[in-house]
């Protein structure tokens, strides 16, 4: 969500009030640093005189438009959860490599009969970066079909700050968790024809932990590459299988960077075959033009806002886009952070204040901070001691989303950066890319995703722009529409929200099976 939650969670978290933005200073300093930009510079230890006047103006614009944000900022972090390090004998395997001397992979063979999430072979464990005290949790499920030959998928949720176990238990994984905290078999799990790795990243997400933090996508990419290299070293039987990276929401940032990092590594021991991004945030400068149309009746659903609110969104849009453009030009935290704060409040805020579900424009929130009460069942399930013991979890409290990470990424300027440039790079290198979007999502809506794919510069951009939109059929029924040229495909999924596998499990299952079978055109 975009917190994204998964990515979505991340999206929710971008609103200062929703994420509890806290950049509060010591009380002795509060009086002398009254403005938002002064607070921000103090928080990161930079002198205000060193900040360009134009950038300062961006912060002042935020403060003028949204005055309450100053009182909501605090420079503080929450308590770190207790860590329960497992004895060395708990782990079945340790994996190390001379090429990656700072990394180690711990592997535990899981007994499927204990948790009954699936009957397939499973492993869980941690990637350790001891020098930086970083520990990434993962859970691997073999394919239900032909694990020796089926593809491997790495699944990433977004936020930033949301656990990929949300994808496992809420969307595309082996089981759903019901109100009685029992796993319910999912016949449309994506591991029907692929083995899947669920990775909690960056650190301090889900069961991952660290005494430090990661606040930008590029740094996270280096750790993900190391994880994959050690994983495939331990499981050489998968090295020649197709390997895909898939995710949603803020993974629209993660995946392009991670895939580009992987392709830059000449000694990789696995076969990156494609990437899939669902309802992603990838090109903010284009996508932020489409919050007003989606909220105001132009996205295939009735308007949820009165005319004056829609007009106000248009009035503030020009300033929003100018701030994002400044971020694209400089890519500095002090330019990009005010763009995120201003635009998220001006373009997402009016919809969010209605109380409707930002992940599905058809629905009201039905409970919980992420609008889905079922997500609370997952948190409760994963906080049970017998579950944590079975997985080897070393964190005593599991949370679907970590709002501090969301805040850290926002204030590091990561939110508004032009990560679509990495998609151009991937396409130019010949890697197949699928961008899919449920058409009832608001926060990373299909209008914005369609728009940025249409204007993306790459070697075959002209051909993609001119390609015809065609019906996507599942079992003879219209399930969406797609556009394809060469190795680039955009797919609109009908009647699905931010999390397409949740709303349209059968159609999403067909989508991924067709894609990983090598049908990159959907013809």
UniProtKB/Swiss-Prot annotation:
Residues 21-107 form a propeptide. It catalyses: Release of a C-terminal amino acid with broad specificity. Transmembrane segments: none annotated. GO terms for biological process: proteolysis. Disulfide bonds join 162-401, 296-310, 320-343, 327-336, 365-371. Glycans are attached at residues 193, 271, 484, 487. This is Carboxypeptidase Y. It comes from Komagataella phaffii (strain GS115 / ATCC 20864) (Yeast).
């Amino acid at each position: 969500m975009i917190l994204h939650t998964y990515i979505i969670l991340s999206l929710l978290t971008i609103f200062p009030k929703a994420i509890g933005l806290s950049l509060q200073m010591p009380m002795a300093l509060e009086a002398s640093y009254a403005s938002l930009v002064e607070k921000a510079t103090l928080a990161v230890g930079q002198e205000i005189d060193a900040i360009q006047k134009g950038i300062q103006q961006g912060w002042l614009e935020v403060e003028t438009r949204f005055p309450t944000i100053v009182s909501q900022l605090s420079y503080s972090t929450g308590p770190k959860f207790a860590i329960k390090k497992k004895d060395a004998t708990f782990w079945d395997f340790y994996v190390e490599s001379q090429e990656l001397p700072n990394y180690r992979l711990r592997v535990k063979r899981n007994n499927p009969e204990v948790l009954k999430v699936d009957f397939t072979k499973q492993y869980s464990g941690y990637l350790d970066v001891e020098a930086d005290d970083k520990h990434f949790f993962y859970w691997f499920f073999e394919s239900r079909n032909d694990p020796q030959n089926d593809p491997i998928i790495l699944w990433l949720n977004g936020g930033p700050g949301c656990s990929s176990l949300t994808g496992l238990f809420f969307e595309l994984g082996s089981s759903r968790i019901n109100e009685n905290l029992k796993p319910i078999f999912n016949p449309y799990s994506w591991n029907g024809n692929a083995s899947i790795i669920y990775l909690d990243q960056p650190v301090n997400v889900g069961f991952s932990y660290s005494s430090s933090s990661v606040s930008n996508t590029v740094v996270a990419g280096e750790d993900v590459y190391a994880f994959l290299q050690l994983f495939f070293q331990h499981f050489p039987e998968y090295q020649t299988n197709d390997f895909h990276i898939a995710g949603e929401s803020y993974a629209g940032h993660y995946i392009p960077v991670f895939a580009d990092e992987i392709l830059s590594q000449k000694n990789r021991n696995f076969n990156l075959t494609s990437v899939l991004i669902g309802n992603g945030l990838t090109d903010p400068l284009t996508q932020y033009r489409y919050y007003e149309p989606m909220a105001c009746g132009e996205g295939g659903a009735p308007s949820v806002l009165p005319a004056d609110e829609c007009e106000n969104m248009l009035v503030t849009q020009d300033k929003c886009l100018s701030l994002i453009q400044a971020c694209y030009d400089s890519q500095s935290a002090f330019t990009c952070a005010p763009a995120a704060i201003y635009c998220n409040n001006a373009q997402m805020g009016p919809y969010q204040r209605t109380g409707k579900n930002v992940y599905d424009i058809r629905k009201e929130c039905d409970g919980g901070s992420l609008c889905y009460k079922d997500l609370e069942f997952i948190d409760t399930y994963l906080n049970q001691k017998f579950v944590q013991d079975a997985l080897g979890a070393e964190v005593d409290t599991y949370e679907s989303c970590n709002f501090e990470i969301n805040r850290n990424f926002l204030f590091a300027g990561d939110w508004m950066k032009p990560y679509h440039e990495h998609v151009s790079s991937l396409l130019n290198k010949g890697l197949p890319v699928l961008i899919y979007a449920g058409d009832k999502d608001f926060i990373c809506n299909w209008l914005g995703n369609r728009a940025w794919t249409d204007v993306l510069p790459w070697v075959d951009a002209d051909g993609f722009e001119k390609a015809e939109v065609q019906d996507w059929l599942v079992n003879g029924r219209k399930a969406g529409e797609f556009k394809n040229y060469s190795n680039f495909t955009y797919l609109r999924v009908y009647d699905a929200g931010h999390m397409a596998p949740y709303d349209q499990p059968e159609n999403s299952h067909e989508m991924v099976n067709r894609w990983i079978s090598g049908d990159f055109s959907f013809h």
